[in-house]
């Protein structure tokens, strides 16, 4: 994934820097989240030699049929996989194709999760809070709260049970890129 993280640094870091201004989220966190959310798709598209603009236009994922869907559809949009079920207006606007707008939306989603945990778990601070917020980006704050009150890891309900752990690993690799 170093190759993908390098691409994220080269192509997405400028928009990430802009999107996180004034927020508590560091650049490496949003870069690592993009890698966790869409790194495999980025790698696939780079192997196909697709240009950046094309990748921005076609970055969709989480294809399947959820309860309530009439048929299979994409549920995640943009490098940060904004969920159509949670943010339909944003997705339908097409703003997910603009990396800056998509990253700003990801920051807004994280901030919603942060406010939830600051309200529901005022004793949660520092790295445990940041991991909870990050895990909630993947599986929802209710699931992470349920994990916490049952003394489980914040990633218990995340995809592959490792979302925030994987993001933290990608963060460390990203920080080491020159």
Q: How would you name each of these model-derived features?
A:
Residues 31:
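Histidine-centered catalytic micro-motifs used for acid/base chemistry in nuclease
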Residues 34-39, 138:
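Catalytic metal-binding/acid-base residues of hydrolase active sites
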Residues 2-23, 59-178:
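Non-catalytic cell-wall polysaccharide-engagement segments
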